Structure formats: C-alpha cells, structure tokens
C-alpha cells in the first residue's frame, strides 16, 4: 500500500507515522455514511425547540429506525449539521476536511462523462480525489490502523486514482468504485449487472449473485468479515461503512414493506422507507457484531447522511421530502444540506480508557453547528493522531461539542458553493450565525444576479425572504461570503463567452 502513495508526501506527516500498533493501544472507529439520507428520514427527531429539546415531526412517525434510536440514546446527535448538497463533494470534504470550494469537486461525479453542466467552471475537479490529497484514512494507516472501505466510494471518475479507494489510503476496498448508485439492490439481479449496458453493477460481491441477499445486507456481511480479521490480527481498525442505500433506484426491501402501507404515500415513497429501515438493520447488525467480538466499548461510531434527503415525497423547492424544512438533495435550502449526525461509543463504559480520553454525552442533543469538514480532525483526535503538517483544514475537531459542551472557538459559519446546474443551480449559500444568504449567479444574464436572505432563528423553514428589508445584513453576509470564497480559492460559473462570473452586490 505505502508504495502507492507519493513518496514525496511522507515527510509532510512523519510525526503521525508509527509501526503497526496493538488493538489495545488505540480505539476502533466506524464512520457509517448513508447515501442521500436527509435530516428527516428517520424516527429519531433532530428538530429542536427554542430550548434545544427534540420535537417529533410527522416524517419521524413515518420512518422506523430503531437502531438509530438505540445509537442516539448511547450518544449525542447534532440538530444542525451541514453537508454539501450532493454526494461527491460531501465525500471529498469528509475525506480531506476541506470545503468543496477548496477541493473543487463541486458537483457529483458522473463516472463516464464530465458533468460540468453548461456554465460550470471549466477546471472543476471532475477526477476527484488523488493520492496527493492526504485523506485521513491514509494518515490512520500510517499510524498503524487497518483501514477498511465497504460500499459506495464515488471519489473519482472511471480511470482516475479515486476510482479505487486503495489508491487513496485504504488497505481494503469492498464494493467501492466510480459509480454513485447501484444498478440494483437485489442479489438476484447481480446488484445491477446488465449485459451490454453501461455498468452500474456494484463490484466485488459476485458471491451474492443469484441469491436473495439485499445489497445493504451483503455489505454488512462483508464488513463483519473484515472486522473479524482485524480483531484476529489484533489491530485497531477504521471502517468507512458507506451504504449505497438510500440512493435510487427505489427498490423495495420486501422484509419491511408491511410497515409502510399509508395509502397517501406513493409506491416509491414506501420503497424508499424500506431502504431506510434496511440500512437501520445494518447499523444494528454491526453494533451487535461489535458486542459479539467484545470490542464495542473500544469502538466509536460516527453516523451521518452525505447530503440532503431525496425521498420521493416532493420537489426540490417545496416542503415535501424534508418537511418541515424546505428543499431536498441538490437544492440550496436547508433540506438540501442538513443531515443526521450521531456520535456514540458502541457500548458506553465510563471506566474505559478510550472513553475517558474522548467522552461522549449520552442521550443528548447538540444545537451548535457542525459540518462534514469537521470529521477529519475529529477522527484523528479520537485516534490520538496529529493532523499532517501543512494540510489545510476548513473544519475543526468536534471533541468538546461531542462531550455535550459548547465550543466558542468553533466556527459558526458554513459556505455551500455550487457553480453548476442541478435542482438548485449556480448558487453560493452562506450561513453565519442565525443568518443565511443565498446568492444566485445568472450565466445567461450576467449583470442580473440575485439573492435571498433568511433569519433562521425566526424562520428556520425559509418561508420569508427578508433581503429587501434587511439590506445592511445582506451586504454584511455578502462580504463575508466573498471573503470565504476567496480564502478557499473558489472557481466560479462562466457566461456564454467563458468569462468567469464573480459575485457582486446589487442593492434592492
């Protein structure tokens, strides 16, 4: 593995390099990522009232996620946790600790073709992650961890280094490739093997072909095997458990369809709900395996979705799939970027040395903002490994917040830069404290950009644009947004003559 990473990088983080260590010396870490799972796609309530108490919403009554409930009781969940609005940018941000504007994978990666979209930046990073990105699994590997990737990768296009997670710093890759969605969830269909068609088949799971093993279960079984091997080798492990669920196609997991019979919901919405419950079963099975192996108290689980929800319950700018929030995956609204985030020890034990070193509040809700960029430094903090020298981070550790405390030093802003066409097109959104500005570039009419402003403390569901009434605040946030874009060396949309469209402020 080491020879696959640029040798010139070794000196950059030699302070983090160790020989293989014993499992008793470092905790195990599982990052459990669910594709296209939004904040509301669960029975665990993340919406809070003014006092920070959870408030159940109708969608929380629709979904069944008992193992997420189990995990939440054992740990802390964040009511306000931000991801990028689509998958590839989020996954790159998780792996690098950098915002999409900086790593420049600002759109989802279409495996075969550059999906820059008509006015997208010419030099956006379609090829995705490379071995020079210093993703944190590689840093962990150098510190003696066994690093395991199971499931969706979507780190790069076909033929790129990022198409195979083993090129980036994982010892083991099972089922990860350039594809962003499975051809099928059914083993009977070979998880998408279609003769003569572009392959969306999930690789490496041939042993389950022609069986009734649902994809989420196949991935869980493979993860269990790798955990067992790491335990036998007496090595601490990092598991990137990255489900293809709940991305389309919305195929029914027949084991759970009896739970979703609301005649007001369409068939696809019911199928989506079964994918959610099947994913939740995987979480429970994994937690049970950790208990069975006697390593649960030494294993931290970080659970999250990779972008806003995509439930087939409404459009990109309404209050359907993410209700009461507006929008869904790919949109500029809160429903497009807010995701579930839970951190817990797999078996809480106040006397455990790892848990003493990294305490996690139990059955708690953290209302302070976190982002996917914070995962990189947080994971390394759990492992007791230093961030590589000269590696730029846009996030910071969530250690104090995970312990249930407030962290005044933690950033209270989030920049979401999407210079492409999608459900929400050519926009930058910027949240600072309670205020959120959405700036729209206008490639076909470059002199007529426009913007919206929301006060999320008074209007969390983005129903009232107050830009005209709050011009001073709009201009203030615009200035902070531009400063952040420049700091991260962002690329911008272009017009029909390929001129870069930099943001400028127009008073209303």
Task: Give the positions of each predicted feature.
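C-terminal cap/loop subdomain of S1 sulfatases and analogous C-terminal strand-loop tails that border
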Residues: 172, 310-334, 344, 349-364, ...
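Short, structured active-site-proximal loop/turn typified by the sulfatase FGly-forming signature C/S-X-P-X-R
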Residues: 49-91, 97-99, 146-147, 168-177, ...
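Active-site-proximal N-terminal segment of extracellular/periplasmic enzymes that hydrolyze or transfer
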Residues: 24-76, 153, 464-472
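Metal-dependent active-site segment of extracytoplasmic phospho-/sulfohydrolases and closely related
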Residues: 236, 242-243, 278-317, 342
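Bacterial Sec-dependent N-terminal signal peptides
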Residues: 1-25
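Loop/turn elements at helix/coil->beta-strand transitions in domains of secreted/extracellular proteins
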Residues: 25-30, 73-79, 142-148, 168-171, ...
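Long, internal low-complexity/basic segments
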Residues: 24-27, 34, 39, 77, ...
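Formylglycine-dependent
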Residues: 105-146, 153-237, 243-252, 264-273, ...
């Amino acid at each position: 593995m080491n020879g696959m990473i640029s040798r010139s990088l070794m000196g950059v983080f030699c302070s983090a390099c160790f020989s293989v260590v014993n499992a008793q010396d470092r905790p195990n870490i599982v990052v459990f990522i669910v594709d296209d799972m939004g904040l509301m796609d669960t029975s665990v309530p993340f919406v809070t009232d003014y006092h920070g108490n959870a408030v159940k919403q109708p969608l929380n009554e629709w979904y069944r996620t008992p193992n997420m409930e189990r995990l939440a009781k054992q740990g802390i969940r964040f009511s306000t946790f931000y991801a990028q609005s689509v998958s590839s940018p989020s996954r790159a941000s998780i792996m690098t600790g950098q915002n999409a504007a900086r790593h420049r994978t600002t759109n989802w990666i279409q495996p075969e073709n550059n999906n820059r979209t008509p006015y997208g930046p010419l030099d956006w990073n379609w090829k995705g992650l490379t071995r020079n990105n210093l993703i944190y699994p590689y840093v962990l590997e150098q510190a003696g961890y066994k690093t395991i990737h199971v499931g969706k990768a979507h780190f790069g296009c076909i033929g790129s280094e990022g198409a195979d997670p083993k090129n980036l710093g994982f010892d083991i890759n099972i089922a990860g490739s350039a594809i962003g969605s499975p051809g099928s969830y059914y083993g009977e269909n070979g998880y998408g093997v279609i003769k003569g068609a572009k392959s969306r088949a999930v690789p490496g799971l041939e042993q389950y072909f022609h069986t009734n093993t649902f994809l989420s279960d196949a991935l869980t079984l493979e993860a269990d095997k790798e955990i067992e091997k790491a335990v036998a080798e007496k090595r601490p492990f990092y598991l990137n458990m990255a489900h293809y669920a709940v991305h389309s196609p919305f195929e029914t997991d027949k084991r759970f369809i009896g739970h979703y019979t609301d005649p007001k919901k369409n068939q696809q919405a019911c199928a989506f709900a079964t994918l959610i419950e099947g994913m939740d079963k995987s979480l429970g099975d994994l937690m049970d395996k950790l208990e069975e192996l006697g390593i649960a108290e030494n294993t931290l689980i970080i659970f999250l979705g990779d972008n806003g929800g995509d439930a087939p319950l409404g459009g990109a700018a309404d209050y359907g799939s993410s209700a009461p929030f507006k929008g869904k995956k790919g949109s500029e609204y809160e429903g497009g970027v807010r995701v579930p985030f839970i951190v817990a020890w797999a078996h809480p034990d106040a006397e455990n040395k790892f848990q003493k070193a990294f305490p996690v509040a139990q059955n708690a809700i953290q209302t302070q903002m976190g982002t996917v960029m914070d995962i990189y430094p947080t994971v390394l903090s759990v492992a007791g490994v230093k961030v590589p020298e000269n590696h730029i981070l846009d996030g910071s550790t969530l250690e104090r917040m995970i312990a249930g405390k407030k962290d005044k030093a933690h950033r209270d802003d989030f920049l979401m830069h999407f210079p492409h066409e999608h459900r929400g097109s050519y926009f930058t959104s910027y949240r600072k404290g309670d205020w959120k500005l959405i700036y729209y570039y206008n490639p076909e009419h470059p002199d007529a950009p426009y913007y919206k402003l929301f006060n999320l403390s008074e209007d969390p569901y983005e129903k009232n644009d107050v830009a005209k009434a709050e011009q001073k605040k709009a201009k203030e946030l615009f200035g902070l947004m531009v400063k952040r874009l420049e700091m991260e060396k962002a690329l911008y949309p272009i017009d029909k003559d390929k001129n870069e469209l930099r943001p400028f402020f127009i008073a209303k």
